[in-house]
Amino acid sequence: MEKMESTEEWEALLSSSSNGDELTMKLIRNGLAKGFKSQKAAGDAGLYSRFLPYHFTESVSNDSFSSLPWQIFANSVAGNSPLQNEAWAFLMDNEDFFLPVPMNPAQCTALEIALWSLIRVDDQRLFELCHSKSGIRLLSIIFDFDSHPDWLREDVMFNIAERILKSNFPNVLVNVASKIGPKSIYFLIDCMSHKIKLKETATGFYVILDVLSCVGRQFASVLEECFTKEISSAGLDHINHFSEIVMLGVDLLYRDYVSYDTTISLKNDDSSSLGDMEFETSQPSSSISEIIHLLAVLDKRIPKKTLVEKTYASSMELQELYNAVVGVKRECVRFIAFICSKFSTAPDLVRHFNGVALIISQANYDDWNPYIREISVLCTRLLLQNNIENQKIIGGLTPITTTHSDALEEAGFTSYINDKGKVVLQPKTAKNSH
C-alpha cells in the first residue's frame, strides 16, 4: 500500500467505509501506520469529527466486536502523531460521543496502546487522566481485571501502571482498582513485585499502605458476609485474592523496606528514599486500623488449627474458607510488627485501635498460621518497648478461663485457673474434690 498523504485521498477512503467493510477498514488502519503526514491528512479528512464517532457507536456499527475501529484509533496517535491533541479532546471533552466499553481483549489492548501513546511523555494529559471524570472512566475500563479475568493483557498495561504510580497521585489508581475488585488490586501489587521499580521510595511505600488499607476493609467485610449467608464460589475466589494481596503486600514491605533504621521519616517526595523523609503520623493510621480490624474478624471467625484438634469446620464450605485464609493472620501481625519497628508512634496507634490485647492473643500455635506465635511475641515486645501506656494494658490483663481439650478429657484430666491466675492441670477427681 502506497502512502496516502493527501486530504482528498483520505476523504474518499473514509467516505467509502460507512458500511464497515473489513478490507476498507484495514486499509485505513494500515494507512495511519505510515506516519506523520498520513495521520495529519486523515485528521484533516474528518477522522475524529465523523469517522471514529460513527464506527465506535454500536448501534450503527456492523460488528460491535470488531477491533478495527480501536486499532485505527491506536494507529492514529502512534509515534509523534499530529493528532494526539485532537484524539485527547475526543476522549476527554467530547460531549457528543461516549466511548463504548471494549467487548473483547483485542479492543481493550488497542485502547491501552492508544492511551499509552497519549500519556507517555505528557504530564498534563496524565494529570487530566487521573483527575477528570472521563479519565477515571478510562482507568476503570482498562484496569478492570475482575469483569474479564481471562483476557490476556499486554506489557503496555505495566507501562501505564508504572507511569501513574510514579506520579504525584498513585492513590488514584489504587482507589480505581479497589472500587473494581480484588483481581484489579492484585494486578497493581503484583506489578510492584515484578515489573514496576518502586522499591525504597516513598511512592512504593505509600502505595503498599494504601493497598493494605483498602484490602483490609474489603476483606473483613467479605469474611463477615461468609458467616451470614451461603459461601459462593465468587466470594471464595475474592477471599483467595484478598489473601494473596495481604501476603504479597506485607512481603514487599519486608523485602524492600526492612533494611532501614528504626527512626524513619517520610515526606511526599517521589525522588527520595524512605530514609531521607519526614514522617507524618497520619500516613499509616488507616492501614493500621484496617489491618487490626481484619485481624479481629479473623480471630473471631477462624478457629486455630492445633495438633489436638485439627479443625472446627462443620462443612466443606467452611473448610474451603479456612484454607483460603491460611497465613493471613500471621501476615497481619507481621505487618503491625513492621510498622512498630519503623515508627515510634505506631505502638500508640495500635493501642488507639484496640490492637494490643489482640496481638498478644495471637501468641499461640496455629497450623493455619505457621510461626504466628513467634511473630506475635516479637510484635508484643515492640508494642511494649518504652511505652508505659501499652505496658499498663498488659499489666491489667487477667486470664478468664481455659479452653476445652478433647485430648485432656480422654486422658482423664481437666484444667482450670486458680486464685493466683495460674493454669492448673490435674485429674478430674481431684478437681471435683477441690
Swiss-Prot record:
Highest taxon listed in the record's lineage: Eukaryota
Keyword Cell cycle: yes
Listed GO biological process terms: cell division; meiotic cell cycle; regulation of cytokinesis
Coiled coil regions in record: none
Intracellular or extracellular location(s): Cytoplasm; Nucleus
Cellular component, GO, one term: cytosol
Induction statement: Expression is up-regulated during meiosis.
InterPro entries in the record: Ataxin-10/CTR86_families, Ataxin-10_domain
Keywords, sorted A to Z: Cell cycle, Cell division, Cytoplasm, Meiosis, Nucleus
Reported function: May play a role in the regulation of cytokinesis.
Similarity annotation: Belongs to the ataxin-10 family.
Protein name per UniProt: Ataxin-10 homolog
